[in-house]
């Protein structure tokens, strides 16, 4: 059952909130907090990506199409994954595609975002691994904000807890009384007791991960380093948090292993293995970031039937270089390339 309003209580803290799932109304159309939280997370991710793209050797104008494709198909993938986990609960195709009431699986969004975003990078000539690193940072911001949509919807919570921050509402009670609850064999659920606010756990986990990786950006050893560390960090947190939830697909009830935990475990193991391998491979080799060629110069080069011969020396910077230096050097580099293109065009004419 979906509640438009909820009295949400944290008995151990003496706190209670009257929540309305509707944030505001435009022309008779209700805009839900769930969508607002996702939109805020997306905006923060975009601000980060455009502000720091040059430090990864990515031209901000060139990545616009990549972002649009990655976001749209990522959301579609998130919904498709969610529906695939419980396809028989929907009575029509319209219910399957309706996301206003919630129902986006983060794993589907991550997989779709990276997959289709990577293909878009190839199409637009954007370096794939550096773009993945930017995307991983954006995911942490987006997920950290987006999880609060689950709070307003009163969904994606955990099993009973006696911890001070345990949460209770009519929505949690109604769900725990339903037949769709999934818990490990032998675990007893009491609908009248507080539950783990797992949305809060994951939100905090993502924001802490963003802070740690942000401090590591200048120390990264190879392209894709941030992405691998994201997989390990998020996978580890998701494995733990998923074990507390009551709404995920159970694979092995006897030990409480869920499908999402299996994916999280694979991400952690694969991420650690790849991180160790590439760290050893690039040991002692500082990461050099090519200066980003802007979209205007890329288009001009194509008209000249390929890249021009460029005699400039400052075409790369150490990844540890300050952001201000990346801005200055990239601007100067593109000015030199533009002048060289114009000169080459005059000779060709």
Segments (PLM) and residue ranges:
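A feature for loop-to-transmembrane-helix boundaries and adjacent hydrophobic helices
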Residues: 1-349
């Amino acid at each position: 059952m979906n509640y438009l309003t909820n009295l949400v209580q944290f008995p151990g803290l003496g706190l209670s909130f009257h929540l309305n799932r509707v944030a505001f109304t435009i022309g008779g159309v209700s805009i839900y907090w769930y969508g607002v939280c996702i939109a805020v997370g997306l905006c923060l991710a975009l601000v980060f990506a455009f502000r720091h793209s040059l430090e990864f050797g990515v031209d901000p104008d060139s990545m616009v199409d990549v972002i649009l494709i990655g976001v749209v198909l990522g959301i579609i993938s998130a919904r498709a994954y969610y529906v695939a986990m419980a396809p028989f609960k929907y009575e029509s195709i319209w219910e399957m595609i309706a996301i206003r009431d919630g129902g986006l699986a983060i794993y589907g969004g991550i997989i779709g975002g990276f997959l289709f975003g990577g293909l878009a990078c190839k199409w637009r000539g954007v370096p794939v691994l550096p773009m993945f690193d930017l995307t991983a940072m954006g995911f942490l911001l987006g997920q950290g904000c987006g999880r609060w949509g689950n709070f307003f919807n009163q969904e994606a919570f955990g099993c009973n807890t006696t911890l001070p921050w345990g949460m209770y509402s009519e929505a949690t009670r109604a769900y725990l009384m339903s037949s769709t609850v999934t818990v490990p064999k032998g675990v007893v659920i009491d609908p009248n007791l507080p539950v783990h606010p797992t949305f809060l756990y994951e939100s905090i986990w993502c924001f802490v991960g963003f802070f740690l990786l942000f401090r590591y950006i200048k120390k990264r050893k190879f392209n894709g380093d941030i992405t691998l560390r994201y997989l390990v960090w998020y996978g580890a947190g998701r494995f733990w948090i998923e074990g507390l939830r009551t709404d995920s697909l159970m694979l092995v009830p006897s030990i409480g292993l869920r499908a999402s935990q299996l994916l999280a475990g694979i991400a952690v193991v694969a991420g650690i293995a790849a991180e160790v391998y590439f760290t050893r491979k690039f040991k002692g080799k500082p990461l050099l970031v090519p200066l980003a060629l802007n979209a205007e110069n890329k288009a001009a080069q194509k008209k000249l039937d390929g890249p021009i011969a460029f005699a400039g020396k400052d075409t790369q910077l150490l990844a540890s270089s300050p952001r201000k230096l990346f801005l200055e050097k990239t601007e100067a580099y593109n000015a030199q390339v533009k002048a060289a293109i114009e000169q080459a065009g005059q000779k060709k004419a």
